[in-house]
Amino acid sequence: MQLIIHRGTHQIGGTCIEIYSRKTRIILDYGMPLTAPGGKEFDETSLRGKTITELIKEHVLFAIPGLYKGQDPQVNGILISHSHKDHYGLLKYLHTDIPVYISEGACKLIHVLNVFTHKQSHISISKACIVKHKASFDIGDFHITPYLVDHSNTNAITNFTVTVIPAKAGIYRP
């Protein structure tokens, strides 16, 4: 198992972690950054009208093959820890054929929050796979167990235990 932390080690927000093996690739969160380069507050409206290629060049999105719309999907699943935009805010750019593993409450809240955002900023999860507390599931080579806890919003997952079948490999805590 290999791990790439694309964003989230030196700042709060904008979390994006990639875990992969020879056969399986998963993404843990794909959040909107809270700060722009230079330290100013990130302005979501700065994304409007830009292509995926432009956003990769600006380091808002990451060059992850097979993750985005218009590409051949090469990612087996996306795990969303909770419904804060710094954990899910860039989902709208991702290929809609890739399953999104998320708690029921978080999925519903993201849908409801679209009422309060500009239409171009709406997040739609077309392939939601609802996860439940301590109900393990497999994505390719990985065995995953979500742990839901109280947070500042409903059905937050604070830990995903990700193991390579059959050996335990690591824990993700957003």
Regions found by a protein language model. Give the residues of each.
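His/Asp/Glu-rich metal-coordinating catalytic cores
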Residues: M1-Q11, T15-G77, D86-T163, P174
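An N-terminally biased module of ancient metal coordination in phosphate/nucleic-acid-related enzymes
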Residues: I80
